[in-house]
Amino acid sequence: MKLPCWQMIFSRWTALAILATATTLGNPSLGRSATQEEENTRGEQNSRRYCRALPGYLFEFPRDHFSHPCYKVEWWYFTGNLAAESGHRFGYELTFFRVGVDNPYPNPSRWRVDDLYLAHFAISDLGKKNFFYAQRLNRAGIELAGASQDKERIWNGNWVAEFTEQGWKLEAVEGDNRIAFEMRSLKSPVVQGANGISQKAEGEGNASHYYSLTRLETSGYLEIGGASYPVTGLSWMDHEFATNQLQPNQVGWDWASLQMEDGTEWMIYQLRQTGGGRDPHSAGSFVASDGRTVQLEEEDYQMVPLEYWKSPHTGGTYPIRWRILVPRLGLDVELRTEMPDQELVTQESTGLNYWEGSILVQGTRNGKPIQGRGYLEMTGYAGPLQPELYPSD
């Protein structure tokens, strides 16, 4: 069966997977943003009217927190590690996706579908080893979902990320599960990659525009299974927009965000190729406690799997303990999870399965002990990453 492109998306980077289909079907400047006309010219729009992510993009905030309809796919990704006063610990994810719909026929109706919006909401109760997740799909028409600079928010039904002068407010409710957080950004946005782009594959435009808010001080309330907890902790936000990214030989990825107790952050990912090799476009970044950023290339680090977990839901086998080494910056840490079962099974909507969950980080930097918490995402271990992604016409 040939799936519509929106059915390919569920995890924060599973959106990368549909970008290949869309085509067949030091810290860079945070200065002036491109206008829509400049995006159109520089982006060299393809036959389906979308721009490509090319070098030279200049980010402008808060404008770039919101929608970029010139690009086929866009996502806003929030995760965090939080604790109640009792020490009871939680992880969470709230992610919003926008996917452009190729419609060659003009339609003035407010019900028309120009974009589809998906959203994912998950809570990891690390104390009780309970994992909850839900998903949504809505059209942009009649304001069922959207990402508006005027309204200063991204939403899908009553799941909302609202921009404020201090940072963000998040709220999501599904049954007797809920999050309601206020977040204050402690650091400026970090642009990932060189010259305004995060290159994901060989070839011009096979990239995204990608930035992160790496340290969001978070407080509020969390409910799971009807039990309510006041919580505090740290969150991470990623925002990417693009049109072309992955290629057929890229079969999955392992991505980690690390927030250390010394005030530093790390983002590292590896793209896996058919045959088991690591793609040379794997990359990452280090953010010092004062906000200075160091971009990491594929040769700068190693990700070594140490322990595996076999899912009782899909039969997939995931590496749930890793060693990460960045010799250039003196880092040697292990990542492990307190709760192996944080797999999302999405056969009823996307047909994709992936692991996304809270992790502990412990090791050394320059020979001194270091520890923290983070989030780990792994795709392509439980069935094809891109089912029917490259069908013949």
Predicted regions located by residue number:
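Short hydrophobic transmembrane-like helices used for membrane targeting/insertion
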Residues: 8-9, 18
